[in-house]
Amino acid sequence: MKMFESLDSSATKSGRDLWAEICSCLPNPAQEDVSNNAFSDSFMDSHPAGEGSMAAADSAVQPALKPWAPLHDSEVYLASLEKKLRRIKGLNEEVTSKDMLRTLAQAKKECWDRFLQEKLASEFFVDGLDSDESTLEHFKRWLQPDKVAINTEEVQFLIPPESQAEKPEARDEPAAAEQ
């Protein structure tokens, strides 16, 4: 056992003697024989308040006894454990930027589809002014041209003029053949 030199005297003391001064609750060798045979812990403090507090004050500061309370970071710790458990189970609910963009794109598409499919009377009024069907169709075509069917005017515009001239001639030939 290592010996320590005391500041008060020039005599050296053993480690056990120093611990006995610091913690007066250590059993004496004479008491050890009696206490070995019986269970002596009563789950109470081994020394009353005030006794041994002078020796303890010299070595370290004792925290005041408080009722149990969760630590300040216990909620953070529990949240991290729950997060790890979800990750292990594969129930990771963390939303990534890719997931956000995908969800927003899907919501945008659904809104446009709903807008283009619905034919409500409120759509035909813009700021209290009557708006005809062609204006609404023009607006829809401008927003999403691939979603709106073309009308007869647009079909006539797309057909080249020479094929339109051939159609009446083709109709006349079967009529002449019947005569």
UniProtKB/Swiss-Prot annotation:
Entry keyword set: Cilium biogenesis/degradation, Coated pit, Coiled coil, Membrane
A Pfam family the protein falls into: CCDC32
GO CC annotations, alphabetized: clathrin-coated pit
Name recorded for this polypeptide: Coiled-coil domain-containing protein 32
Function: Regulates clathrin-mediated endocytsois of cargos such as transferrin probably through the association and modulation of adaptor protein complex 2 (AP-2). Has a role in ciliogenesis. Required for proper cephalic and left/right axis development.
Principal location class: membrane
Domain of life per record: Eukaryota
A GO BP annotation: cilium organization
UniProt biased composition (Basic and acidic residues): 164-179
Compartment(s) where it occurs, according to its Swiss-Prot or TrEMBL record: Membrane, Coated pit
InterPro entries found in the cross-reference section: CCDC32
Stretches of the chain forming a coiled coil according to its record: 75-98
Residue ranges, annotated region (Disordered): 157-179
Topological type in the membrane: Peripheral membrane protein
Complexes and interactors: Interacts with AP2S1; the interaction is direct and mediates association with adaptor protein complex 2 (AP-2).
